[in-house]
Structures are given as structure tokens and as C-alpha cells.
Amino acid sequence: MAEKGLFHKVKNRPTRRRFVVSTIRKDENLFETAVFEANFFYMPRRWNQPEFTVASSTPGEAWDLHAKLTVRLTHEYPARIIQEYLEAAPAPR
């Protein structure tokens, strides 16, 4: 597989906030999609603290999630999306 990761700059239309959606391959069967709030130049405000992360086990699942988040962050209110994914994620121990 030639693709190692995906990266998209997103400007939210309702709030005009900027985000970066990044998907990377962490391991052979582990992909991580992270959403960062960004500044005017689309540089993440906090590199080590994304708004949320979602793990995937297959490349197809990771790419689909990346595309879905990119579209949703463009059109929907970001707080609603962030809350949805934080509630779905298991609590750290």
C-alpha cells in the first residue's frame, strides 16, 4: 500500500472555525484519525492534544471515516460532532 496517511484542511461554514483532519497508519492493522482545531494558517493549535481521535483497523474503514469527518466538519456544528465522538469513545482507565 503506497498511501501512508491523509491530511485535509477544513473550514467550518456555520462557525468559520478551521480544522485539520489527519489519518495516519500507526501499525500494520491500526489507523488513527485525529481532528485538530487550527489557526488561520491551518496549523493545529495544540499538536499533542487533538479534539478527538478515532482508531480503525482497516485502511478502507480509516479512509471512509476520514472522508466522512471532512464533509461533516464542513457543514455541521463542530461541537456536536466532537461531543458525538467523545461519547462514543471508551473512557480511559
Predicted feature residues:
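A short, exposed loop/beta-hairpin motif centered on an aromatic-Gly-Thr core
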Residues: 41-64, 68-69
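Short intrinsically disordered, low-complexity segments
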Residues: 37-38, 66, 92
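Generic detector of bulky aromatic hydrophobic side chains
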Residues: 33, 55, 76-78
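Short arginine-rich
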Residues: 67-82
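Intrinsic-disorder/low-complexity coil detector
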Residues: 13, 43, 49, 58, ...
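Generic signature of intrinsically disordered, low-complexity, basic-rich segments
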Residues: 17-19, 29, 52, 67, ...
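Short N-terminal "domain-start" leader segments
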Residues: 1-35, 39
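Intrinsically disordered, low-complexity charged/polar segments
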Residues: 81-93
